[in-house]
Amino acid sequence: ITPRTFKGEAFAPVIPSFQYAYNKGRWSLQASFALTGGGGKCTFDNGLGSFEKIVAETAMAACGLAKTVDNVLGNTLGQPGMQMFTTDQAFGQKGEYSYNSYMHGRQYYYGLSVGAAYKFSDNFSAFAGVRGVYASTNYYGYVENIKVGNMPLYKVLDPNKENAANIELSCDQSGIGFTPIIGVDFKTGKWNFSAKYEFKTRIRLKNKAVNQAPSISALPDNLSRQMVGTLTQVFTNKGMTPENAQAVAANTTQAVLTNGDVVKTMAGLKTEFDTKLKEAIGEYEDGKKIAGDIPAYLALGVGYSPVNTVRVNVGFHWFDDKHATSYNNRQEKLKRGTLEYN
C-alpha cells in the first residue's frame, strides 16, 4: 500500500475586472466585467480521496469474494483450505492494493453586470442591476494500473484489455445564469452605512464528456474462464485425460459460481463498486445537466471618519451556501452558509 497525500496545487495569478460608470445628475449608470467565480486551475498529482475510496473498498470486496470462492471450491473438492484466488500471487487476504491516479480541474465564471444607481437625497442612494453569468469548467482525471494484492484488476474483468479496469474522466461543463442585484447607501455626519444583496443565481451545467468506467458485469464469465483453465490443469496433472479434466473443471466451476454465498458476495461487490463509482464520477456523465447554483450573497458595511484623512471600515459578508442547489443536493449536508468579517 502506498501512503498518499491528496494535495491540490492551485494557480490563479491574476483575476482581472473592468468597471465603468457614467454619472449625470442624480443618476449613475454602471457596468462591469469580471470573473465572479472560479478563476483558476487546480491539480492533484495523486488524484482525489474519492478515487482512492473506490479502489480501497473494491480491494476489500474483491478479497472477500476470493475468500468465499476458495472456501466453496475447497469444500466442493473435499479440500478445505484450498487456495486459488487468495494466494499472495493473486488477490491475497489482506486487502492490499495499489494504483496510479491524477486529477486536474479548471473553473471560470464570467460575469457581465449592468445597473443604475439613483441619488434620492444628499444622504441616501439606491442601486438595482443584473449580472449575466457564463460558467465554463473542465475536469480531467484517471485511476489506472489498479492491483489488488498482486493481481491486476483487469485480469478478472477483461484479461485481453489492460485498460479494462481503468477509470477516466474528461468532462467540459457550461451553463448560463442571471443574478438580480440591489443595494443601498446612507450617509449621516461622519458615518456611512451600506448594504448589497445578490440573489441566488440558478445555473444548470451541461456536460460534454468522454469518460471510461469499468464494468463488473463480465466478472462471473472471466472468473469462470480462469477457474476452468486452472482446474483443468490440476485434474490433468492428477491423471485425467484433457477432455475429462476440462469437463470436470467446467462442472466444478459451475457448482462453485452458482453457490448461494458466492452469488450473494459477487452481487454485493458489483453493487458496492457501481455505487462508489457513481458517487465519484456520476456528476460528470455525458449529456447530464448538473445543478451548480451560485449562492445568494449579503454584504453589510459601516464606515466612520473621525477626521477627513482617516476612515475606518468594517464589513460583514454572508454567503447562503445552504440554499444554493448543487449535485445530489449536497448543500443539505451543510449546517449553514459562510460568514466573513473584515
Describe each region flagged by the PLM.
Residues 1-11:
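Surface-exposed strand-loop-strand hairpins of Gram-negative outer-membrane beta-barrel proteins
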Residues 15, 21-342:
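Outer-membrane beta-barrel porins/channels
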